[in-house]
Structure formats: structure tokens, C-alpha cells
Amino acid sequence: VEMALALADQVPQLALFCGEPLLAGHCAGLRMRAWGHLRMRRVQVREHCPISRIDGNCLISGEASVWRGNRLLLASGAQALPWIAASGLSCDGDGFVHTAPTLQSHSHPQVFAVGDCASLPGVRKSGLYSMRQVPVLAANLSAALRGGALRDYKTHGQRPLLLASGDGGALLGWHQWSAGGQLYGRCKDYFDR
């Protein structure tokens, strides 16, 4: 959504394909605000349209061609790399490394995994959560090398989601609350730095 809104004024025809509902898992208010911004910026949105393959200059969903064009920017959600599952590390059903709160692999405690390659209950695959794991990862790598005690990464419940709206503002979603505007854009800019 952020990428589509950022590109909307620079790309004459822009389409966003979602395998599930737009911003699935987030509050209805945030989804409605995002839909409004996308419509206002003339971004075509296709929900429940997972892209199964790219054939030449066509996007295919199932067996149907759903888009044809010369320029494609593909942004998928987090996907486990095939080598991870083939490595012998314990993985979840999607191929992400099972990790303990110490960020160690359950099957190979000498291996640490964070971010989009790791599966830690209660932690979304998002840059925000990955960045919050870094201090614990750094401390634990140092402790492991010294033979010291490891710290647990603690999830802090649902954090607010800020999506850049492409106009200097941002959309906020938190639990069942949503808002939008320039103030939230300044907050997002501050947090991203």
C-alpha cells in the first residue's frame, strides 16, 4: 500500500494486486482510509487476486491473465528462502526458522535468526519488529561468544501501524482505532529515522 501510494503520482496507470483483502488483519477503519487514499490517487486495487506466475508481460492469477504491461514492480510479503528449509534447521510450515525468545533456532541453538527469516510467536514480519530485535540479537551474540546469559526478546503487544500515504502524511491503525494526516506523517518520519 505504501509503495503504491508513493508511486501513484509518478506512474500513469498503477494496479495493486492483493492475495487477500487489502490490509487483512488490520482494523476496518485503517482499511477504509487506505482504500480512500488509493481511490483518490487512481490506484486500481484487486483483492483476492493472488499472482501465481508471471508469463512474459502478463500477471497470471490461477489460470487467468489479470494484467498486461511493460513495467512491473513486484513487492511480496515475507517469504522464506528455500535454502532455509533445506538447511536442516527446524522450520514452521511456511519455511521460517523456529526461534526461541532468545532468538536462537530451536533445533540449532548456535544459530540465531531474526526478521523475515524467523518465526517467533506473536511477532509480525515487519521492519519495525525486525529493528526492535536488533539490540537483543547483538547482546545475545556477544553473550553467546562469552558464555554469558542470553536475554529474551519480549513482544510488546500490538504496536501502532503507520503507513505513509504518499503525500507527506500517514495512516495510523492501532487495535480498532484509525486516523490519518500530516501529523502522523511527521511521527512516521521520526520513527523511521
Predicted regions and their residues:
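Cofactor-binding loop segments of dinucleotide-utilizing enzymes, especially the Rossmann-like FAD-
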Residues: G19, D116, S165-D167
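Conserved beta-strand scaffold positions in the cores of enzyme catalytic domains, especially
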Residues: V45, V111-A113, L162
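Short glycine-/acidic-enriched loop or helix-start segments at secondary-structure transitions
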Residues: M3-A4, H26, W83-A85, V123-R124, ...
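A Rossmann-like FAD-binding core segment of flavoenzymes
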Residues: V11-P101
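Rossmann-like NAD(P)H-binding beta-loop-alpha module
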Residues: V1-Q13
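FAD-site-proximal beta/loop scaffold in flavoenzymes
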Residues: W67-P135, A139, A143
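C-terminal, flexible cofactor-proximal segment of oxidoreductases
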Residues: R124, Q133-R193
